[in-house]
Amino acid sequence: MSEKMLKFVDIGQQNPPKRDISERKEDFDEIYQEFLKDRAVQQSSRCSQCGVPFCQVHCPLSNNIPDWLKLTAEGRYEEAYQLSQSTNNMPEVCGRICPQDRLCEGNCVIEQSGHGTVTIGSIEKYITEKAWENGWVKPIEINSEKNESVGIIGSGPAGLACGEQLRKKGYKVTIYDRYDRAGGLLIYGIPGFKLEKHVVQRRIKLLEESGIKFVLNFEVGKDSSLTELREKHDAILIATGVYKAREVNLPGNDLSNIFPAMEFLTASNKKGLGDKVELFDNGTLNAEGKDVVVIGGGDTAMDCLRTSVRQNAKSVKCLYRRDRENMPGSAREVGNAEEEGVEFIWLTSPKEFKGTNKIESVVVNKMKLGEPDDSGRRKPVIEENSDFEIKADLVIKALGFDPEDLPKLFNEEKLQVSRWGTIKADFDTMETSIEGVFAAGDIVRGASLVVWGIKDGRDAATSIDNYLQSKQKLRVA
C-alpha cells in the first residue's frame, strides 16, 4: 500500500471552488473551477483503497476508480488518465455531469464513516483535462482496417461510445444524426454551465480524426428508410435517445408561451453556439424579464431553472409535487439553483393554466405525501381546497421524456417496440427484431443518465463485433 494514500483522517474533503454567484449568473460558463495540481493530489490521497471498492461497484462503467486515484496521488497523471479512459469513452463529460452523489461518491466508504466522500468526479475532470492539455488524448490508430461497415443512428453518448469502440476494432463507422451538430443531448440538451460545448466538440473532432464519418441533418424515414440503410451497412445501431416530451393535460394547455423543456434548452444552446434562433431573438423562447414557472423535479427541470436565471428572468419558480427529500434531481443541482435565486415550491402540482391567448398565471394545488406507490415512493395526494395562483409569463414543462414512434418515423413495421414505446432488444445481444439491427441507450432502457448511455454503447459495440465476426466465419466456412 502506498504511503501516499489513506489520508482521509488528516485531510478533510474539499471540492473545487465555485465561481462567485453574482458572476456565474451572468454567463453560461461552467460554475466549478478546476483543482490546482497540489489539491488534486491531496484529495486523491484521501482514498482508503477499499478491499471492496463500492465506488467502482456503483459506477455503471465499473471504472477503476481506486487505481486511478492512487496514480493521481502519486503524480502519475498520464497513467491515471490512460486507466480512466480504458473503461470510459468520455471521462471529461462524466467528471462534469454525472450525479456522483447518487453513484460513486454516494457509496464511498469514508463518506459512510463520516469523513466526507473522495471528490471523485472533480479528480476525474482534472486528470482528463490535463491529458488534453498535454496531448495524451490521441486519435485512434488502426492496425488493420476491416471491410465491414456499421451505421449508427444517433450521435448521443450511446452512439458515440459504440462508434469509437467499433472504430478501435477497425470497422468503418458512419454516424447519422437528424440535427446540424453531432452530440445529441450533450450539445443541445445540457446547458454550458454544466458542460461547456467546446468539451463536446473537441471529442467529436477527435472521432472524426479517427476516421469516423458523421452525416448530419439526416432523418431516417425521410432521407433514407431503415431498410435502405441496413442494405448499405453490414450492421446498424439505433441510438436515437428519447425526445418526446411527456405532457401535462390541463385546462389552458393550448395557451401560448407554454413550452416543453427540450425546446427551451435547445433554443438557448443554439444561441450560445452562435446560431440565429428566431424564437429566441423575438422573445418567445427567452426568459428575459419574465415570471418563469418550471414544472418538474429532475435534472432537466434544474437545467431550465438555471438557464432562466442566466437569461435575466424577473422571477424563477419550480413546482414539484413531492418534497425535497423525494426529488429525483441531483441534490447538488438543487443547491446550485437555490444559490442562484430559484424559488422551490415543494408539494405543489399545477391544476390549470390561465390567460387570454397566452399564459398569465398557473393555478396550483397543494399536495401531501400519502402511502408508498409501486415504486416505493410516497404518492402525492391533493389537499382539498388548497389551490392558489402564481403569476407566469413563461411555463416550461420538464416532466420527462418518452420514445418517439420509431416504427412509424422509420417506416419500418418490423421494428418491434415495448408497450412503453422503447425498442425491444435482446437482453444479451442487444439485437432488435430485425436481423443485423441493434439498439442501445435510452431508446431501449428509457430516459436515463449519460453514463448509462456510454455503458450501453460499449456493450452494443461488443455485440455488433461478435455478430460480424460470426458472419465472417460462416462465409469462410
Model-predicted segments: where are they?
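Extended, hydrophobic alpha-helical segments in both membrane/secreted and soluble proteins
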Residues: 55, 59, 157-162, 292-294, ...
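Predominantly flavin-linked oxidoreductase catalytic cores and closely associated redox partners
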Residues: 278, 282-316
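FAD-binding core/adjacent interface of flavoenzyme oxidoreductases
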Residues: 68, 93-96, 101-153, 169, ...
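Beta1-alpha1 glycine-rich phosphate/pyrophosphate-binding loop at the start
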Residues: 3-33, 62-74, 83-85, 112-121, ...
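Immediate flanking context of iron-sulfur cluster ligation sites
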Residues: 34-54, 78-103
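A structured beta-alpha segment of the ubiquitous adenosine-cofactor-binding alpha/beta core
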Residues: 36, 209-230, 276-284, 347-393
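FAD-site-proximal beta/loop scaffold in flavoenzymes
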Residues: 254-289, 373-447
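A conserved FAD-binding loop/helix module that cradles the flavin
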Residues: 304, 443-468
